[in-house]
Amino acid sequence: MTIEKHERSTKDLVKAAVSGWLGTALEFMDFKSHAC
């Protein structure tokens, strides 16, 4: 039971990290495109 919960927790952490990175990358590209 705890193993499944741990796996789900790790999956959520990875999902959050990837989402945060993608959001930052998109925001950076948006900033660069409007800065020129």
Curated annotation (Swiss-Prot):
Induction of its expression: Expressed at low levels in stationary phase (at protein level).
Superkingdom of origin organism: Bacteria
Name of the featured protein: Protein YnfP
Gene source species: Escherichia coli (strain K12)
